[in-house]
UniProtKB/Swiss-Prot annotation:
An individual GO BP term: phosphatidylcholine biosynthetic process
Top-level taxon of origin: Eukaryota
Sites bearing N-acetylserine, chain numbering: S2
Name of protein: Adenosylhomocysteinase
Family, similarity comment: Belongs to the adenosylhomocysteinase family.
Length: 449
């Protein structure tokens, strides 16, 4: 494939000015990314990096992209979801000169086309040498269709739980060809983005889509991992009566100890009025469950892919489907009752709203930037010696790695000032007593926060 005829394809370039205003607002709420620009801008640690990114093309992602560029990288971009692009964000990034191929409401074919287009949009027909992914679609495409691009690739960083599961499967099957950093399992990602991000953005998506009163409703949350915990807390905070389904006895016990009733989907499907899937698995809600649901049950997903809900069964077996408004469809079933599907079974917080807030995404994206630096500089011993926070980041073998604790703690520190947090300092005596450095890291890698 030759280089694209133009260096972007988006919905409307005239939205760029609007997008730029929102990017400027978001920058104030993303202190981690701004601190990284300040700390490493003069060093240009990503000079020479060519990063292909596949992640929701939102305002917050625009700040991430411009941070990578500010550190010296050349970047191309596509979205990792057909509904999640904010068109004004894509326009602002395109207007800044970054090749971006994304718009809200892509077809499946257009989605794959966009991912492939970005691979051939680097200057002088050069190939990528870093991948920044969310969900694994870009990683899979390059490994399966363009393996020659991996020859000079320093590695990849993966944003989300689903993509990390895919990476470990690739390792097991011997298919992963470059080092990968699991950004999702950084504490400042999984315990913040997954938990606190979902705690706010889930309800935002449901409310914008349906205007439903959640107080008093029976809400069913499938899965009680970090995402499920945030969703359950949000729904309970709105006054809903929350049921949880789980396969893992530890997570089930956690849910029970928090006061949630843990049931099976078979039982919950008869009484639930709002259903949220958070598992990263498939077939969580199937045809049998749809038939059992009460009138106008609301069904949505906040996991990465659309296979948690059997949307194909719904489309094949419904007597009628009426589109109420974008991303809100009402299906008539053989039971004579209706179900309301949000975002076509894809991410409800991005399909029906604008996703997580800027502040929590700053935590996640700070990890992404540090991961990209760690990969690109993994063989640069002088850089790692000068910047002690990167001493333990390389060289990397092919496999899946996590960022060291010192970088995780650094991300947290970047965000404390905006919240008015003042840290207590260890004394020398206390440091010696605990056996940890005065400046950290403060916890062992196995510590569970």
């Amino acid at each position: 494939m030759s280089a694209p005829a133009q260096n972007y394809k988006i919905a409307d370039i005239s939205l760029a000015a609007f997008g730029r205003k929102e990017i400027e607002l978001a920058e104030h709420e993303m202190p981690g990314l701004m601190a990284i620009r300040k700390a490493y801008g003069d060093v240009q640690p990503l000079k020479g990096a060519r990063i292909a990114g596949c992640l929701h093309m939102t305002i917050q992602t625009a700040v991430l992209i411009e941070t990578l560029v500010a550190l010296g990288a050349e970047v191309t971009w596509s979205s990792c979801n057909i509904y999640s692009t904010q068109d004004h964000a894509a326009a602002a990034i395109a207007a800044s000169g970054v090749p971006v191929f994304a718009w809200k409401g892509e077809t499946e074919e257009e989605y794959l086309w966009c991912i492939e287009q970005q691979l051939f949009a680097f200057k002088d027909n050069k190939k990528l040498n870093l991948i920044l992914d969310d969900g694994g679609d870009l990683t899979t495409l390059v490994h399966e269709k363009h393996p020659e691009m991996l020859e000079d690739c320093f590695g990849l960083s993966e944003e989300t739980t689903t993509g990390v599961h895919h990476l470990y499967r690739m390792v097991k099957e011997g298919k992963l060809k470059v080092p990968a950093i699991n950004v999702n399992d950084s504490v400042t990602k999984s315990k913040f983005d997954n938990l606190y991000g979902c705690r706010e953005s889930l309800v935002d998506g449901i409310k914008r889509a349906t205007d439903v009163m959640l107080a008093g409703k029976v809400a069913v949350v499938a899965g009680y991992g970090d995402v499920g915990k945030g969703c359950a807390a949000a729904l309970r905070g709105m006054g809903a009566r929350v049921l949880v389904t789980e396969i893992d006895p530890i997570n089930a016990l956690q849910a029970a100890m928090e006061g949630y009733q843990v049931v099976t989907m078979e039982d919950a499907s008869h009484i639930g009025q709002v259903f949220v899937t958070t598992t990263g698995c498939r077939d969580i809600i199937n045809g049998e469950h749809f038939i059992n649901m009460p009138e106008d049950a609301i069904v949505c997903n906040i996991g990465h892919f659309d296979i948690e809900i059997d949307v194909a069964w719904l489309k094949a077996n419904a007597k009628e489907c009426i589109n109420i408004k974008p991303q809100v469809d009402r299906y008539l079933l053989s039971s004579g009752r209706h179900v309301i599907l949000l975002a076509n079974g894809r991410l409800v917080n991005l399909g029906c709203a604008t996703g997580h807030s800027s502040f929590v995404m700053s935590c996640s994206f700070s990890n992404q930037v540090l991961a990209q630096i760690a990969l690109f500089k993994s063989n640069d011993k002088s850089f790692r010696e000068k910047h002690i926070e990167f001493q333990k980041t390389g060289p990397f073998e092919v496999g899946v790695h996590v960022l060291p604790k010192i970088l995780d703690e650094a991300v947290a520190k970047f965000h404390l000032g905006n919240l008015g947090v003042r840290l207590t300092k260890l004394s020398k005596v206390q440091s010696e007593y605990l056996g940890i450095p005065e400046e950290g890291p403060f916890k062992a890698d196995h510590y569970r926060y």
